[in-house]
Amino acid sequence: MQAKAVTKYVRISPTKVRPVMDLVRGKPVDRALAILRYLPHKAAREIARTIESARANATNNYDMAPDALIVKYIFADEGPAFKRIMPRARGRADRIRKRTTHITVIVDDGEEM
């Protein structure tokens, strides 16, 4: 059975989040959280929060054992971008896109329904 957690509108670019996700994909939840705890990335904190939420959803909503959970699917989708203006020389302006990310984690205990 699977349980899912989504964190939306995280103010970090998806391209910065995806390499951190690759480190924990397919690993047991406890091991994934241990890996993320010692990474110096902002993305690691946000991913850890989402994994903990998925684990809580699995144990509270679906009565799954928290020790048996693995990170089956984890991916980052692009959210809306905040558009800002940066003044440039000669009266011009450049657009700055502050990107956001939607983080999705699906944990599985390996049992079929």
From Swiss-Prot:
Which Gene Ontology cellular component annotation is one that this UniProt entry carries?
Answer: cytosolic large ribosomal subunit
InterPro entries from the entry?
Ribosomal_uL22, Ribosomal_uL22_bac/chlpt-type, Ribosomal_uL22_bac/org-type, Ribosomal_uL22_CS, Ribosomal_uL22_sf
What keywords are assigned to this protein?
Answer: Ribonucleoprotein, Ribosomal protein, RNA-binding, rRNA-binding
Instruction: List the residue ranges forming a coiled coil, or say none.
Output: none
What GO MF annotations does this protein's record show?
Answer: rRNA binding; structural constituent of ribosome
- Look up keyword Zinc and say if it applies: no
UniProt xrefs under CDD domains:
Ribosomal_L22 (cd00336)
Q: Which GO annotations describe the biological process of this protein? A: translation
Q: Which Pfam families does the record match to this protein? A: Ribosomal_L22 (PF00237)
List the PROSITE patterns hit by this protein, alphabetically: RIBOSOMAL_L22 (PS00464)
Q: In which family does this protein belong, per the annotation?
A: Belongs to the universal ribosomal protein uL22 family.
Subunit and interaction comment: Part of the 50S ribosomal subunit.
Q: What does this protein do?
A: This protein binds specifically to 23S rRNA; its binding is stimulated by other ribosomal proteins, e.g. L4, L17, and L20. It is important during the early stages of 50S assembly. It makes multiple contacts with different domains of the 23S rRNA in the assembled 50S subunit and ribosome.
Q: Which HAMAP family match?
A: Ribosomal_uL22_B
Q: Which PANTHER family match?
A: CHLOROPLAST 50S RIBOSOMAL PROTEIN L22-RELATED, LARGE RIBOSOMAL SUBUNIT PROTEIN UL22M
For this entry, the protein name equals Large ribosomal subunit protein uL22
